[in-house]
Amino acid sequence: MAKLAITLTRSTIGRPEGQRVTVRTLGLRKMHQTVVVPDNVAMRGMINKVSHLVTVKEINE
């Protein structure tokens, strides 16, 4: 099953509350922090919501 490596590349300062909550829900707290999450519809939806703040790489295992 594929996984996604998500890195927070832009700050959430000055962003709407919904975007801040989405970034926190993805497990990101600090700039340049990377988390590995499963590749599913829910995660893809959250990534689309904050795509301008994060970078995503696909990991094949």
Swiss-Prot record:
Superkingdom of the organism of origin: Bacteria
One GO BP annotation here? translation
Instruction: Please give the Gene Ontology molecular function terms for this protein.
Output: structural constituent of ribosome
Question: What GO CC terms are in its UniProt record?
Answer: cytosolic large ribosomal subunit
Q: Which UniProt keywords apply?
A: Ribonucleoprotein, Ribosomal protein
Q: How does it assemble?
A: Part of the 50S ribosomal subunit.
Which family is it part of?
Answer: Belongs to the universal ribosomal protein uL30 family.
Q: What is this protein called?
A: Large ribosomal subunit protein uL30
Give the organism, scientific name: Exiguobacterium sp. (strain ATCC BAA-1283 / AT1b)
Q: What is the lineage of its organism?
A: Bacteria, Bacillati, Bacillota, Bacilli, Bacillales
Its encoding gene is what? rpmD
